[in-house]
Amino acid sequence: MSIGFYFDMSRCTGCRACQIACKDKNRLEVGTIYRNAHTFSVGSFPEVKCYSYSASCNHCESPACMAACPTGAIDKREDGAVILDREVCKGDGACVEACPYGVPKLWEDGKAGKCDSCYLIREAGGTPACVAACPNRALDFGEVEELKKKYGDALVSDIAVLPSSDKTKPNVYINAKEAATAAARKAGKAWD
């Protein structure tokens, strides 16, 4: 079994409610975020198109952060969630350097931290804070096969602002706007 996130670009307004909910739930320091919402523009006037993307840990099938960690502080749970144990972390930053998505962050105390898919909330029957906070329901979370059944076959894991999914096999499924995939093709990132 593998868990993952679904993101619908057609529903996201870039409000950052997901980002704020994650920051609040994790009691993160100023300047540290585990979920990051951005709005991107493609083209030039008068043919400008925009799209927003909300990024966090993709709980990859082959997590580069876990492979790079020399202390074993990063582990993949049975459900597929990639968890970082800050008590075991020695703060060498190998996970930060290894993740192609830039997900793990070093805190002021020198130790790393990252999205844990709110696994304690999920174990209590809830949903991740970011998903619960989204006013437009642009985010969802669940077992990968269930997400694919629920949202269909048109989902992608590669868009212009992300590195190729070939290396880590991220468990993020995106209902992408044409602007995000067209920009990828124009940049020579034609994954489809």
Which functions belong to the PLM regions below?
Residues M1-D192:
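Non-ligating segments of multi-cofactor redox enzymes
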